[in-house]
């Protein structure tokens, strides 16, 4: 169809007392015309070949469109109402009827219809009727096929408005014979009044923004193609529903062996070899509120946790089977306080010890003389989880810490005892190792440890000269037994998660 063609297709046209199927074309003489040109061809081939139409008619002073019921052997009818004539078209399917109606309405502009009842006391005969509004033209029609019984121009009306259970309007002197007050019974009086207000003010309430054409139905689709389209849409909907049900079945829940209902199953109902993995529930971490447990109450808290785990029954034990007791869930602490085994940091290297030392001890400014890195100085929550290693020591299978990097991690100043000045004076020159002069800066050999003054230094020691403070801060490399403190290194077993002390 071209731009001037409104709608075309096969339809039944009333010819005397018979219905004849013809190829009909409804077009506008110009894009701004308020009339329609009806062209009748015997077949579609005549239109394609460019043959002259068999009948042509101009439909002027259009008042509206009315979809009618069965009429003389035709199931669906569409009446094109004009002031002087009515053109009645017949269709075999409701889809074709609605397609023609939608295209004609969009082409004509503001076309509306309402079922009303004419009340007595006016020039019109009382009874049911249809109120048609086509742009500025208002008309009342009745009977089958419909016939115009009254018409008015909207600019010629004196007043109009809704009333309880009805709509009233008054025609002025320009309306001629149809001047006067007319009262219609309708439940859509507010909608009628709204449309009157919009059309009188030049507003199109049913049109979108300029240049946007809605998707109009195709009138050439047959009943068979409509059924195929409906079947295709039904199949697509069933396919989407089956996909949604399949996705929902993959997220089913099942209880774990320890009664933990938070375990997630990865099974699918559509697979014959599907299986549920309920062991995830034993690895799920239980989030608890941080509590402040004193170190002296650490043993009591561990005993309570063991008693609670022992009192919890196992469902599998009721069936006669025996399973090893499940490992108590580890408790997550706040950020920066998790152990190196949880954070994935490898143990036994210089970088891992220096990077995770604060996570084990919680803070470096603790009491003097604490054994850093040991299980006794860990935070309370971590102390409950760490246990001694129970693995057998097999030569060659255990990672050995390199000797050159064994004591190179940063040692807190509160661990090492203050080295007296007499110890430094009594040391032999060979024990000092590769100690450099003050002018050489901060160079140190890999074998010496970094010693700092204790927290209880006197004010005189803080005001020493740079050379004296540097000499007093350097420690021996381990040759003198009285100048070196005992260092405890704690490693975490990669197999069982226990700690080893070396």
Swiss-Prot record:
InterPro entries linked to this entry: Dok-7, Dok-7_PH, Dok-7_PTB, PH-like_dom_sf, PH_domain
Region annotated Disordered, chain positions: 210-232, 249-279, 291-358, 418-482
UniProt source species: Takifugu rubripes (Japanese pufferfish)
GO molecular function, one term: lipid binding
Protein location: Cell membrane; Synapse
Biased composition (Low complexity): 264-279, 301-316, 347-358
GO CC terms of this entry: plasma membrane; synapse
Protein known as: Protein Dok-7
Annotated Polar residues bias: 336-346
Basic and acidic residues compositional bias, start-end: 459-473
Domain remarks in the Swiss-Prot or TrEMBL record: The PH domain mediated binding to phospholipids with phosphoinositol headgroups. Affinity is highest for phosphatidyl 3,4,5-trisphosphate, followed by phosphatidylinositol 3,4-bisphosphate and phosphatidylinositol 4,5-bisphosphate.
Taxonomic lineage of the native organism: Eukaryota, Metazoa, Chordata, Craniata, Vertebrata
Superkingdom as given in the UniProt entry: Eukaryota
A GO BP entry: neuromuscular junction development
Key words, A-Z: Cell membrane, Lipid-binding, Membrane, Synapse
Protein task: Probable muscle-intrinsic activator of MUSK that plays an essential role in neuromuscular synaptogenesis. Acts in aneural activation of MUSK and subsequent acetylcholine receptor (AchR) clustering in myotubes.
Gene3D superfamilies: Pleckstrin-homology domain (PH domain)/Phosphotyrosine-binding domain (PTB)
Domain IRS-type PTB: 105-210
Topology in membrane: Peripheral membrane protein
Residue span, PH domain: 4-109
């Amino acid at each position: 169809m071209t731009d001037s063609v409104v709608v075309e297709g096969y339809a039944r046209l009333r010819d005397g007392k018979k219905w004849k199927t013809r190829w009909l074309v409804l077009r506008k003489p110009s894009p701004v015309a308020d009339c329609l040109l009806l062209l009748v061809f015997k077949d579609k081939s005549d239109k394609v070949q460019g043959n002259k139409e068999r009948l042509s008619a101009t439909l002027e002073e259009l008042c509206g469109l009315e979809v009618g019921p069965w009429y003389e052997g035709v199931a669906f009818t569409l009446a094109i109402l004009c002031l002087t004539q009515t053109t009645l078209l017949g269709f075999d399917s409701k889809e074709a009827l609605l397609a023609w109606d939608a295209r004609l309405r969009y082409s004509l502009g503001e076309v509306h219809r309402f079922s009303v009842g004419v009340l007595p006391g006016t020039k019109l005969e009382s009874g049911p009727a249809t109120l048609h509004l086509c742009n500025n033209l208002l008309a009342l029609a009745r009977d089958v096929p419909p016939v115009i019984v009254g018409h008015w121009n909207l600019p010629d009306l004196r007043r109009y408005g809704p009333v309880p259970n009805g709509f009233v309007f008054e025609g002025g002197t320009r309306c001629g014979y149809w001047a006067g007050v007319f009262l219609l019974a309708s439940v859509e009086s507010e909608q009628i009044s709204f449309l009157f207000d919009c059309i009188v003010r030049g507003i199109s309430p049913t049109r979108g923004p300029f240049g946007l054409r809605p998707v109009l139905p195709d009138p050439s689709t047959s009943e068979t193609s409509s059924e195929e389209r409906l079947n295709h849409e039904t199949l697509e909907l069933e396919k989407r529903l089956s996909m949604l049900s399949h996705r929902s079945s993959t997220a089913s829940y099942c209880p774990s062996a320890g009664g933990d209902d938070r375990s997630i199953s990865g099974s699918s109902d559509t697979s014959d070899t599907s299986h549920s993995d309920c062991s995830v529930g034993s690895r799920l971490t239980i989030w608890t509120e941080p509590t402040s447990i004193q170190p002296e109450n650490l043993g009591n808290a561990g005993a309570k946790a063991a008693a609670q785990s022992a009192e919890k029954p196992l469902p599998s034990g009721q069936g006669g089977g025996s399973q090893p007791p499940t490992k108590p869930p580890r408790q997550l602490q706040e950020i920066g306080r998790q152990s190196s085994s949880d954070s994935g940091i490898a143990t036994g290297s210089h970088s891992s010890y220096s990077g995770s030392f604060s996570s084990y001890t919680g803070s470096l400014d603790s009491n003097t003389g604490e054994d850093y890195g040991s299980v006794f100085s860990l935070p309370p929550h971590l102390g409950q989880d760490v246990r001694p290693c129970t693995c057998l020591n097999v030569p060659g299978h255990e990672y050995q810490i390199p000797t050159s990097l064994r004591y190179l991690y940063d040692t807190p100043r509160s661990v090492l005892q203050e080295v007296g000045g007499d110890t430094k004076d009594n040391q032999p020159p060979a024990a000092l190792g590769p100690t450099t002069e003050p002018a050489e800066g901060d160079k140190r050999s890999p074998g010496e440890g970094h010693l700092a003054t204790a927290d209880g230094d006197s004010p005189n020691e803080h005001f020493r000269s740079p050379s004296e403070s540097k000499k007093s801060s350097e420690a021996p490399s381990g040759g003198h037994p009285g100048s070196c403190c005992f260092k405890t290194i704690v490693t975490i077993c990669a197999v069982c998660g226990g700690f080893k002390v070396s």
